[in-house]
């Protein structure tokens, strides 16, 4: 036997042992009705060509591996950024298990959320009873300061009235009448997680701000970070920069502590987050800035309605984007950008110059959320790199127009193509027919790396197969330095692998790069 009590093997080496190889081969032969190997090989090779690419890109009724998630996931993430807030998803239990596992696998932290556990009867007769019982249990068991309600497909298809259900639950004593239960409709069959995030944040702000008098506090700023798998590192880095500038600010939806709790013997179901007191006071801010435009369109519109100035960015990382963000903050707050931050900027510029010979002319395929793809394309062009494929499954026509304008602004973007609404199976065809040097995305890109040989750089949610990336920033000048290092490490690692064969390629296996 390949293992015993004295020799325990991990699954990776275990399944490579002869006994398991034989078992898997027999299983395939006897139970999987396999096609002849030659036919499989021919089809595989056909799928790499231009003829298949045209068929692949013409798909309309089938989606294969979309680079997005559903609205309620964004709503659950949004709720995690507020003080002692329990996310309550009106729908089936299985859906909520998906949101929790997705967040837990990325952040390596518990992700708390509950559901109304709707089943077949609720799908027919409505989920009012589930809502009443669920809110009562949530309030009694988990001691939240706020319960944020969102929805799944089931509740939206039958048209459950969240506002009416919540009021009924309060009248029946499930929660006290004054208890805060904001809500948002987040149907999973349209939009994506960024829309769910936007709707939930808007719903929470509307809950606390509607009907309240506003007294503007000059120079104060609200920051909405957006759905960000790197929120732990990014939020803390931006807070550090704003503190160095002496800015009076409030982070609206800050999940950095919730998804980075310490191991000190105390379990924290809730940790950190924007306090309800700060949330109420945020109405009086002079301006609200969003770090991700496509994550906050509804929210910023509401902020303008209450009288605030607004501005939106596209995931401010790199030189130009960080410059624009800090200058906007400086203009609103009246605070100068201190010398400490100017030095950080200079160090990033110096690092980019030091490594220019390795970065210039590198080609990239970038996929992910619209703001992230925009930001990464802008950053690689700053380094002399060339984006060739920019893909966002949840990208809109407006995003495509913005991307086209960005890419046209630099000679490094002239050969780029923008792909809104396409999925990762389409990207596979693009990588085979128009190969690039590097692929930037999330863990789902590892199958593209396996098939096409394009090195994957994991820089976006979700990252399941690597640990702790989210603890370090991508935004700001310090984040840009880490991003630069990550790209360079991937380039050098590949070069080392390609030049390590003794007496064949090792004349370029250099100690100094």
Curated annotation (Swiss-Prot):
Cofactor comment text: Binds 1 [8Fe-7S] cluster per heterodimer.
Q: Name one GO molecular function term.
A: ATP binding
**Broadest EC class assigned to this enzyme:** oxidoreductase
Read off the CDD domains from this record. Answer: Nitrogenase_MoFe_beta
UniProt key word ATP-binding: yes
The reaction(s) catalysed by this protein are: N2 + 8 reduced [2Fe-2S]-[ferredoxin] + 16 ATP + 16 H2O = H2 + 8 oxidized [2Fe-2S]-[ferredoxin] + 2 NH4(+) + 16 ADP + 16 phosphate + 6 H(+)
Q: Which UniProt keywords apply?
A: ATP-binding, Iron, Iron-sulfur, Metal-binding, Nitrogen fixation, Nucleotide-binding, Oxidoreductase, Plasmid
* Positions of [8Fe-7S] cluster binding: 70, 95, 153
Cofactor(s) essential for the protein: [8Fe-7S] cluster
**Tagged with keyword Phosphoprotein:** no
Q: What does this protein do?
A: This molybdenum-iron protein is part of the nitrogenase complex that catalyzes the key enzymatic reactions in nitrogen fixation.
Q: Which family does it belong to?
A: Belongs to the NifD/NifK/NifE/NifN family.
What's the subunit arrangement here? Tetramer of two alpha and two beta chains. Forms complex with the iron protein (nitrogenase component 2).
Q: What is this protein called?
A: Nitrogenase molybdenum-iron protein beta chain
**Organism whose genome encodes this protein:** Sinorhizobium fredii (strain NBRC 101917 / NGR234)
Q: Which gene encodes it?
A: nifK1
């Amino acid at each position: 036997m390949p293992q015993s009590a004295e020799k325990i093997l991990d699954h990776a080496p275990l399944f490579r042992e002869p006994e398991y190889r034989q078992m898997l081969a027999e299983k395939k032969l006897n139970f999987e009705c396999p096609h002849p190997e030659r036919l499989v090989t021919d089809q595989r090779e056909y799928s790499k060509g231009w003829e298949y690419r045209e068929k692949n890109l013409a798909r309309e009724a089938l989606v294969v591996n979309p680079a997005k998630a559903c609205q309620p996931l964004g709503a659950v993430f949004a709720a995690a950024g507020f003080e002692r807030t329990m996310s309550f998803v009106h729908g089936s239990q299985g859906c909520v298990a998906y949101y929790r596992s997705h967040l837990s696998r990325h952040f390596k932290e518990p992700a708390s959320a509950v559901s109304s556990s709707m089943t077949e009867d609720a799908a027919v007769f409505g989920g009012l009873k589930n809502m009443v019982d669920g809110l009562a249990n949530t309030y009694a068991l988990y001691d939240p300061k706020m319960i944020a309600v969102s929805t799944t497909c089931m509740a939206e298809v039958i048209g459950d009235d969240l506002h009416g259900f919540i009021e009924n639950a309060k009248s029946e004593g499930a929660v006290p009448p004054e208890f805060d239960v904001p809500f948002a409709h987040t149907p999973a069959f349209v939009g994506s997680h960024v829309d769910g995030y936007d709707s939930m944040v808007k719903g929470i702000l509307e809950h606390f701000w509607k009907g309240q008098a506003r007294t503007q506090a000059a120079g104060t700023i609200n920051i909405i970070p957006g759905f960000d798998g790197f929120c732990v590192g990014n939020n803390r880095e931006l807070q550090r920069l704003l503190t160095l500038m002496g800015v009076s600010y409030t982070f609206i939806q800050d999940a950095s502590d919730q998804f980075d709790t310490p191991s000190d013997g105390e379990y924290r179901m809730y940790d950190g987050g924007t306090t309800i007191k700060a949330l109420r006071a945020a109405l009086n801010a002079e301006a609200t800035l969003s770090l991700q435009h496509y994550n906050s369109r509804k929210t910023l519109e509401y902020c303008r309605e209450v009288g605030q100035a607004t501005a939106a960015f596209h995931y401010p990382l790199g030189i130009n984007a960080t410059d624009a963000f800090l200058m906007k903050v400086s203009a609103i707050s009246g605070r100068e950008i201190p010398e400490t931050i100017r030095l950080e900027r200079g160090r990033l510029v110096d690092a980019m110059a030091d490594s220019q010979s390795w970065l210039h002319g590198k080609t990239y395929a970038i996929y992910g959320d619209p703001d992230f793809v925009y930001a990464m394309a802008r950053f690689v062009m700053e380094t002399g790199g060339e984006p060739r494929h920019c893909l966002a499954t949840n990208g809109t026509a407006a995003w495509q127009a913005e991307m086209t304008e960005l890419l046209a602004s630099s000679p490094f973007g002239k050969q780029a193509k923008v792909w809104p609404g396409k999925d990762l199976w389409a990207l596979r065809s693009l990588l085979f027919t128009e190969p690039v040097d590097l692929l930037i995305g999330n863990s789902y890109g590892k199958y593209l790396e396996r098939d096409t040989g394009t090195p994957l750089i994991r820089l976006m949610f979700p990252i399941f197969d690597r640990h702790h990336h989210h603890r370090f920033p991508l935004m700001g000048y310090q984040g840009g330095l880490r991003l630069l290092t990550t790209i360079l490490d991937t380039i050098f690692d590949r070069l080392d692998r390609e030049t390590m064969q003794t007496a064949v390629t090792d004349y370029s296996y250099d100690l100094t790069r």
